[in-house]
Amino acid sequence: MKALIYARVSTNKEQQETSLKRQEEELTAIAAENGMEVVKVISEKASGYEMDRDGVFELLDEIKNADIDVILVQDETRLGRGNAKIALLHCIYREGVKVYTTAHRGELELSEADSMVLEIVSIVEEYQRKIHNMKIRRGMKRAVKNGFKPQKNLKNQHGNSGKEKIEVPISEIVRLRANKLTFAEIAATLRGFGYDVSKATVHRRFQEYIENEETAE
């Protein structure tokens, strides 16, 4: 298994520096005991109540983009405290990554309360995903009902021109907006027809169109 070591202390005091090194040494030993290959070590000095930590974002990038099987930490509070801990554990488990701790000399054993909260978060996320998909379908139906014809309006507009700017059918954005669709619904509709666009992109393109029209006048 490929492992990532994460060590954290909350202050810059000299004794905390020693604690960081001790955490790394203990976690390296656990990796060796379990036949793990340590591919990354992340150490930082920051409050566990904060999510805006460089080390946390580096950890999330690694588990999403690299072949990481397990996170090694001294104990679960090193990942974070309070809601920050729950949020980070949810992100880690969602990627199918395990958490091993020095305290357990193996895989993290969550408290009953933390397990229940994580289960609730997963259920809520699943329903959010279902609602998002329903919004896409509703947006597509509403667009078609208001005269949007994808086989005609989006014909030959998927060609990759190599431009960095995302190509979107601005005429359809304007028309769908005129039919009272929100920017979120327009983005969902276009994604349903194969365009990888966000609400922000749709809004930006619409604003550019309005500004160009005003300039032309």
Swiss-Prot record:
Coiled-coil regions listed: none
Induction statement: Repressed by LexA.
Domain Resolvase/invertase-type recombinase catalytic: 2-147
Name of protein: Resolvase homolog YneB
Family, as annotated: Belongs to the site-specific recombinase resolvase family.
InterPro entries with a match to the protein in the record: Resolv_N, Resolvase-like_N_sf, SSR_resolvase
A single GO molecular function term of this UniProt record: DNA strand exchange activity
Any Pfam family: Resolvase
Annotated SMART domains: Resolvase
GO process annotations (BP): DNA recombination
Catalytic site positions: 10
Organism domain of life: Bacteria
PANTHER family for the chain: DNA-INVERTASE FROM LAMBDOID PROPHAGE, RESOLVASE HOMOLOG YNEB
Species assigned in the record: Bacillus subtilis (strain 168)
Matching SUPFAM superfamilies: Resolvase-like (SSF53041)
